[in-house]
Amino acid sequence: MALERTFSIVKPDAVERNLIGEIYHRIEKAGLRIVAAKMVHLTEEQASGFYAEHEGKPFFPALKEFMTSGPIMVQVLEGEDAIARYRELMGKTNPEEAACGTIRADYALSMRHNSVHGSDSPESAAREIEFFFPESEICPR
């Protein structure tokens, strides 16, 4: 197993429902360490930059609208096989298909309002972390 970092977002729907602490508890209980975190309210420009790979897709405008609708929590997680472990903890994108006990099965309202985001590869983790956090803001534990 390899020590790695992944990127996570607690999305506006979960922040609005005061689920940050519950989600952080699950992250830490799963053996992942939060090594950087902050609350931000994305501008349309920031959302466009972060989700640039989806520009031109039919869901892009709605995605930007949702992700700019309220504050989000962004965090860097660190641990053994952090990417795979966090993706398992999140559950499938569609909460109806997510395994019982996963974040999305328990908290997601819909496929769009699915409470959390997590990087899907080492490359996307590096890009997403760099988008929000300079290395000086990450505190290995």
UniProtKB/Swiss-Prot annotation:
Which positions does UniProt annotate for ATP binding?
K11, F59, R87, T93, R104, N114
Q: Where is the signal peptide?
A: none
Where does it live in the cell? Cytoplasm
Q: Name one GO cellular component term.
A: cytoplasm
Molecular function GO terms recorded: ATP binding; metal ion binding; nucleoside diphosphate kinase activity
Keyword Cytoplasm appears in the UniProt entry:
yes
Query: What's its top-level EC category?
Result: transferase
Biological process terms in GO annotation: CTP biosynthetic process; GTP biosynthetic process; UTP biosynthetic process
Give the catalytic activity: a 2'-deoxyribonucleoside 5'-diphosphate + ATP = a 2'-deoxyribonucleoside 5'-triphosphate + ADP; a ribonucleoside 5'-diphosphate + ATP = a ribonucleoside 5'-triphosphate + ADP
PANTHER family in the record, alphabetically? NUCLEOSIDE DIPHOSPHATE KINASE, NUCLEOSIDE DIPHOSPHATE KINASE DDB_G0292928-RELATED
Quote the protein name from its UniProt record. Nucleoside diphosphate kinase
UniProt organism field? Vibrio campbellii (strain ATCC BAA-1116)
Q: Which gene encodes it?
A: ndk
